[in-house]
Amino acid sequence: LATLNYAAYGCGIRYHYGMFKQKIQNGYQIEVPDNWLKNGYPFELRRPEYAKEVHFGGYVRVEYDPEKGGSKFIHEGYQAVKAIPYDMPITGYDNDVVNTLRIWDAEPIVDFELDSFDKGDYKKAVEQENLARNIVEVLYPNDNHYAGKELRLKQQYFFVSASLQAAIAKYKKKHDDIHKLYEK
């Protein structure tokens, strides 16, 4: 799009591993994980000031809000991760257009639950960390089983939720009426 002189803004997931890297070993082709971020990536800019919280699951409780004179919706019982944006410039060919690709990394809200660990619940102690890691670890998990389908859905929901939150926050900085968002 940048080469065609279109201003655009893309979003995706900052996967830690690509699908695979091919190597020849003992005369045979083998596939190994592609750890493309092992040495960092110089063309990306970490933007923690624009981090978003993404919720999975839970339920919504409705209660009356006397200040607003209406209903208030409260999301509870969910799992959450922090979506950290990394911005990458996408330059056009033979023009001055530079677009942005924002890719989201997932981090735990709480790194380690010492209380759970001390009680012997080792799985719960690292649950947040594992949820975040699983979302961004590998591009296209095998989804021929339930766990793979669930992870792919979480990955898609993760980057859509973070991207929409960012777009709405950016809109609200300059505009008061959210009902006119469609005009922009």
Residue ranges and their predicted role:
Residues 2-184:
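A conserved ligand/cofactor-binding region detector
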